[in-house]
């Protein structure tokens, strides 16, 4: 090859430096270039058109006029191929000069191209990149690390501004070419530059080359549209995949550069310094991302020191972040060993090193990263942790008050962290499911008026209006109904609700969240049809394979639910069905029950399948439990093979015993317990017994979510203390039968269009078809003892709106916290809330509630009148 056969020709721009440019006539068919590059630069005659677009100041992408330099795209190929050609020609001094020339040429373009990127990044500054980050690599960028080179490539095509003159498009093809050069047979490389290329690296290179349309595709169609970028940038997921591809190519190119130009270390040209500019300052990958295919690359990780293990000459550190754990290895002879050895657990560090495969016997199949480890070369301590009050690693139990006081540490623990991520994904699913059904999301006010909805309000004093208070909403009830009156057909929101009530296992004190929704022109069946697929879907999606009741869910009337299950929120996993056995005890020889029945009591039978063979101590234990729960005891009959046994059986005629056995669907080998009281307390106690026996005998169906609707709630009930009629549940429900029922029926016989959705004995939601007519609303409240003036005072806004045309409407509000609690299989709702209060409604982390300075109270015109402490009575 003659020395004059150069592929470069000058291209000058006013005010710009001379830059080499590929002569397509030289490239096409030249033996120094592979067919793919010849096709790329000269195929289909598109090269000139591309150069014209690059040089057009008014082009759509805003590119400034400049030349296309080959960079490493051709530099790597030229060096390898020309070394081979010169050696074969044996041209002596001419060959040496030729080699020197092409060496300098190739080295210049590798250095210039990569340092150009680094300089571009430094000139623009990180803040400008970060400003465009979401539009460049997607919102979930940590899952696909935003390597600076990938971010740069994305930014230049997606952000049209005037600083693009610092970027050279040949960098893209340079990265591809550096890797592609490694696929040349070792015999054609100087000093065997490609003899240790792994199959994984070849696969990455081939995949990447095809992604970018370089290999085997000639000039792809995307160039014919005069855009320089591949279709991989059309969606966030494709951009993320491209980011990973580019990062992989850079890593491989870096590891092979010294072999492509032997004797000319890359550090001499600032290549490694430029490459360090490509890696993010804190991480190139997450701690849950590296796999066996990444072996050989350089990686940077940041996270918390999860565990440390000192094996003498090696220190193993499990580094943890939000995404997972990666094992890092530090040799005792390493200069960074001392710094890392002193880092306590939960210190935050950044490590840089080489990814290597673990040996077969050290692979950890429990970790997604268990096939690799990081050989640490550099360590930066970001922050040192104090001695921990609670350990993050491990599964040690701690008192709840300590966990809540150090909740930020507790949230790092694997199970708690997973619960919060589950909560986030569930909320996202619910939101998308509702939008998919045509619902529109709105945000209703947080500061509103106080209204009597069954619990105490949290009150907020008004500084501007002395003596007056706002209230935090117990639910968006009135606002969502007003939205229907305002003409919005389907509303929903993930609504915060605030109630000043005591906490319990399935209820967080203070605040909770619900999937609140409302619909116009609907019946009860329409509401069910709207929410059932959402609930069925979310439990199937996140239920870890557990069975879910298929829609439509079964419906149980309130009366049947109280009779058969002893609760208006039945747990259908429990097969026990309660039976009414009042009549067999009426006038019987068992005087205790007979007398109570004569006074209006009822008797409920709670079967205990297969319990006849239990020892006497088991029955005595249940009897003691009943007394602890306020009952006089728990009578029972054992249906043994040799006949009924127990104190009650001895005082009943055989016919009555058989009637009980038939009514409760009992068989030999079963036992039965009894509850005798007025209807409501008897039903509630029987429900407690049903739950207790189901758990004692391990009868509950496993790995299943059992849904049902409880319907036909009574509109009114009698207050046992006052003897007055009051609303039993939601006062805004439409009475079944409308005005006619209110005028002509006994209030205690009127049912409402009201319903609850229940799963595994947990009430997820109450809902109703609303009372949208002012005349019916006035009458309904009148029966419950409220005057028209009272209704107008407390519900005037909604009532006034109804006077101007209100559509029939209804809705519900499944509790988000309870949904997540069930999916996470947690017994306590505080386990799925980020920063919960304790049972006493205290936030131990933020020390709330807290005393307020007197001057702030004066601004609010509030004087605190604390209860006087009780005086101790001294004995003697």
Swiss-Prot record:
The record marks 311 as: Important for tRNA non-discrimination. L-aspartate binds at residues 453, 499, 729, 770. It is found in: Cytoplasm. It catalyses: tRNA(Asx) + L-aspartate + ATP = L-aspartyl-tRNA(Asx) + AMP + diphosphate. NCBIfam families: aspS_bact, PRK00476.1. PANTHER family: ASPARTATE--TRNA LIGASE, MITOCHONDRIAL, ASPARTYL/LYSYL-TRNA SYNTHETASE. Its EC number is 6.1.1.23. Homodimer. Belongs to the class-II aminoacyl-tRNA synthetase family. Type 1 subfamily. Gene3D superfamilies: Bira Bifunctional Protein, Domain 2, GAD-like domain, Nucleic acid-binding proteins. GO terms for cellular component: cytoplasm. Keywords: Aminoacyl-tRNA synthetase, ATP-binding, Cytoplasm, Ligase, Nucleotide-binding, Protein biosynthesis. Aspartyl-tRNA synthetase with relaxed tRNA specificity since it is able to aspartylate not only its cognate tRNA(Asp) but also tRNA(Asn). Reaction proceeds in two steps: L-aspartate is first activated by ATP to form Asp-AMP and then transferred to the acceptor end of tRNA(Asp/Asn). This is Aspartate--tRNA(Asp/Asn) ligase. GO terms for molecular function: aspartate-tRNA ligase activity; aspartate-tRNA(Asn) ligase activity; ATP binding; nucleic acid binding. Residues 1-278 are annotated as: Unknown. It is an enzyme of class 6 (ligase). The keyword Electron transport does not apply. It comes from Paramagnetospirillum magneticum (strain ATCC 700264 / AMB-1) (Magnetospirillum magneticum). Residues 279-876 are annotated as: Aspartyl-tRNA synthetase. ATP binds at residues 499-501, 763, 815-818. One of its GO terms (biological process) is aspartyl-tRNA aminoacylation. Pfam families: GAD (PF02938), tRNA-synt_2 (PF00152), tRNA_anti-codon (PF01336). Residues 477-480 are annotated as: Aspartate. InterPro entries: Aa-tRNA-synt_II, aa-tRNA-synth_II, aa-tRNA-synth_II/BPL/LPL, Asp-tRNA-ligase_1, Asp-tRNA-ligase_1_N, Asp/Asn-tRNA-synth_IIb, AspRS_core, GAD-like_sf.
